[in-house]
């Protein structure tokens, strides 16, 4: 990140230039910055309005669920079946549904490796349960603060890499 300061008309401002700006410090923001770093991109900047605020960190519900390919039990599952289930709800475009399904197990196992304690059975399978409109046992949870635990584990991974963050700023426009 390159940083410059300039003044005009009695006001001063800071200009930050980077290859990749990630906006937000919820699970999506952290999970965007972390793999970019792993792929070799070092010129990353995370910008957030409040690192300790936001939906991922501060909501709780008995229905907080992580949705992934089925990783336990006798029922088979496939990327295509999961994509079709997502698409059939008429809220996810087909190409997005396919990407979400294809990367769901990898993303889930990354969270496990970072320390999110998703439940397992005695054979080591990551157990799941059925939700209202899902034909498989794809849902899993660590309780009412699942997304908080995911956020905190991803945040630790990003901080360990030293990815810079600007906190208490609101992104209005990104100039490219």
Question: Residue locations for each model-derived region?
Answer:
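Conserved N-terminal/central alpha/beta ligand/cofactor-binding core
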Residues: 2-13, 49-176
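N-terminal Rossmann-like FAD-binding beta1-loop-alpha1 element of flavoenzymes
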Residues: 18-46
